[in-house]
């Protein structure tokens, strides 16, 4: 009887634990639920990470809304947002400006946000895309899904002098991020400096991207807030 009760209590604990993420540096932190969450920008859709879904989180636990000419994002679970009409082919550059109004206001350590390109089969269990994201502490990461997660510059990313640092928690910090496809190269630029460059063949391969052609959008880690402006694509 005692054994059966212990097993039941154990199962209750397993199924009531909130979604948990391991962030940069290995910190463990539960994803929040954002009040008034969901997507209110016409034409836009999104998908939270599979591990967030497995923990019981929903897309409605994060928020995407219009704020002036920009997009206001508050997470919640880690999420990628896109408009299916935003497609890029051939050589192109996608860029946007990300302003974190209050650095680390929803977390106790830095969390990243940035751009996503090369999106294919988005919203399905076979989705693939690449993203470059900045932290307000001067670090950046280049990662993707194919459909399993993959990393291009290590598990903890890398620092670069081009990445702006917030003066401290609660202070604003802004990053201009761009992802470019140029011939056989894919590059990430932050604040007008190329911080990472890869051969296209290293990205368009089994377990990574299906193509560099695809949908572009924005990518946010969990428990993060920023305003995105100037999301544009240019062709050479």
Spell out what each predicted region is:
Residues 6-16:
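Bacterial N-terminal signal peptides
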Residues 80-86, 161-169, 218:
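Beta-strand-rich interaction surfaces with strong enrichment in secreted/lumenal proteins
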Residues 96, 170-203:
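Carbohydrate-binding surfaces in secreted/extracellular proteins
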Residues 150-176:
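Short, aromatic/His-centered strand-loop micro-motif at the edge of beta-sheets
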